Amino acid sequence: MIRNYTEEQLEANYNKFIEAIKKVFSGERLEKLLHMYSPEELGTELAIAPASGKLNFHSCYVGGYIDHVMNVARNAYKIKKMFEDGGGIVNFTDEELFFAAFHHDLGKLGDGAEPYYIPEQSEWHMKNKKSYFALNPKLQYFDVTDRAFWLLNQYGVKYTQKEQLGIHMADGLYNEATKKYWISYDENFQLKTNLPL
C-alpha cells in the first residue's frame, strides 16, 4: 500500500517517533539519539525516507521508513509477549528489543550528507520493476546494517551485544552474512540470546 502523506502528517509521524524514543531510552543514550534524529542531523531524512525502493517491498513511499520501524517495534514487542506468555525465556530487556527494532534499518537514512534512496528517474524501472526509489550513487557503498552501525558510532551511541545481534540479524536467513549465526552445529558458536528470534 502506498501512502501519500502531507507535510503535516510527515511531521506528526516524526514527532510520534521522537516521543517513542523518549519513552524507551534515558540519560546520555537518549541525548545522543535525540541529537542524531534532530532536524539538523538525520531528522529530515528520518521523516521523509521510504523503507524500501520497490512497490512489492515494505513501505515504499515518502515517510515509509518511520511507519516500517514503528511496525517492527510494535510487532517485536507483541511477539516477545507471546513468547513469554508461552513459557519462553526472555533473556533481553525491552530496551534492547526496542533499540534493535528502531535501528535495524538505520542505514537507509544515508550518511548524514546524502540520502540512501533517491526518486527513481527511469520510467521503465517504475513501470516494469515497480521501482520508485533508487539507491543513491553518491553514497559510499555499505550494506544497510553496516551503515547502521557506522551511523550509531558516528553519533557516539553505544549498544549492547544483544542489540548488535538483533540489528545484524534482522533480515534472518535472507542475508548471507548472518547464516553463520543462525546455522551452527557446534554448541560453542550458537546464539546465546533469543533477541533476534
Task: Please state what every model-predicted region is.
Residues 10-13, 65, 69:
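Generic structural signal for well-ordered, non-membrane alpha-helical segments
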Residues 1-50:
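Non-catalytic interface/linker regions that flank or bridge core catalytic/transmembrane domains
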Residues 53-63, 67, 74, 79, ...:
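Divalent metal-dependent catalytic cores for phosphoryl transfer on phosphate-bearing substrates
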